């Protein structure tokens, strides 16, 4: 695993955040399928994420064979992340933590949101314990060159519940492996920070 520079970490985290935030648009899917995007996959492989990069490329090729690839991915996004917790891998800390550990995690997240003056998106009405909000805080820490704090944030805020979330994405009943592969890639990035 190659040690990543700040800009490389930000590039990967922003990319993953955008892909995990909501259903893919036609434009996002076309970009992923474009030949030019293979350079990004090569970059991921070069820095130590070869397994995840290769799996993602293969999955994108499989998705292209569907009659309506974006609709298949939209259905998978819903099934994977938006239904109730018995069938979906809910991307919320509160789905995996409870009691005092949840209370402490959420209190610390609220302090981060206040510190960075981040507002919860009122259009999507996402709670502060959504994975994408955690990624936004992590990105802010990196942007402000707070590398040590970013590593602590990963250990104390994300990895306390993310492994259970990642495992659950693998068990969802979906037609493609696109989202589980993205989550595996994010997990690998977080572990190798």
Curated annotation (Swiss-Prot):
Keywords for the protein's UniProt record, in alphabetical order: Chaperone, Cytoplasm
Q: Where in the cell is it found?
A: Cytoplasm
State the protein's purpose: Involved in the biogenesis of TorA. Acts on TorA before the insertion of the molybdenum cofactor and, as a result, probably favors a conformation of the apoenzyme that is competent for acquiring the cofactor.
Q: Which PANTHER family match?
A: CHAPERONE PROTEIN TORD, CHAPERONE PROTEIN YCDY
Q: Which NCBIfam families match?
A: PRK04976.1
Say which family it is in.
Belongs to the TorD/DmsD family. TorD subfamily.
- According to UniProt, the name of this protein is Chaperone protein TorD
